[in-house]
Amino acid sequence: MGREFGNLARIRHVISYSLSPFEQRAFPSYFSKGIPNVLRRTRERILRVAPPFVVVYLIYTWGNQEFEQSKRKNPAMYENDK
C-alpha cells in the first residue's frame, strides 16, 4: 500500500484505452443525427407504447368518477323528509 506515484504496483492483463479530452467533441452530430433518430424511434414505437397508457388512463379516470359518485348521497332517499 505504501508505494509512491511512479513506483506503483504492476497490473497485468488489463488494457485501458482513453481519448484525450482535447480530441473529443461534446455533442458530435447531435442535431444532424441525434434528434432525427429520436423522432424515428418514437414514430416506430408509438403504436406499441401508447395503447396501454391510454387504457390505464381511461380506467383511472373511470375509477375516480365512480368513487366520487359513490361518496354522494342518493337524493331519492330524502324526498319525504321535511
From Swiss-Prot:
GO terms for cellular component: mitochondrial inner membrane; mitochondrion; respiratory chain complex III. Its main location: mitochondrion. The keyword Phosphoprotein applies. It is a single-pass membrane protein. Residues 1-43 are mitochondrial matrix. The chain crosses the membrane at residues 44-62. The keyword Acetylation applies. The modification Phosphoserine is found at residue 16. Pfam families: UcrQ. Keywords: Acetylation, Electron transport, Membrane, Mitochondrion, Mitochondrion inner membrane, Phosphoprotein, Respiratory chain, Transmembrane, Transmembrane helix, Transport. The modification N6-acetyllysine is found at residue 33. The modification N6-succinyllysine is found at residue 33. Belongs to the UQCRQ/QCR8 family. Component of the ubiquinol-cytochrome c oxidoreductase, a multisubunit transmembrane complex that is part of the mitochondrial electron transport chain which drives oxidative phosphorylation. Component of the ubiquinol-cytochrome c oxidoreductase (cytochrome b-c1 complex, complex III, CIII), a multisubunit enzyme composed of 11 subunits. The complex is composed of 3 respiratory subunits cytochrome b, cytochrome c1 and Rieske protein UQCRFS1, 2 core protein subunits UQCRC1/QCR1 and UQCRC2/QCR2, and 6 low-molecular weight protein subunits UQCRH/QCR6, UQCRB/QCR7, UQCRQ/QCR8, UQCR10/QCR9, UQCR11/QCR10 and subunit 9, the cleavage product of Rieske protein UQCRFS1. This is Cytochrome b-c1 complex subunit 8. It comes from Mus musculus (Mouse). The lineage of its organism: Eukaryota, Metazoa, Chordata, Craniata, Vertebrata.
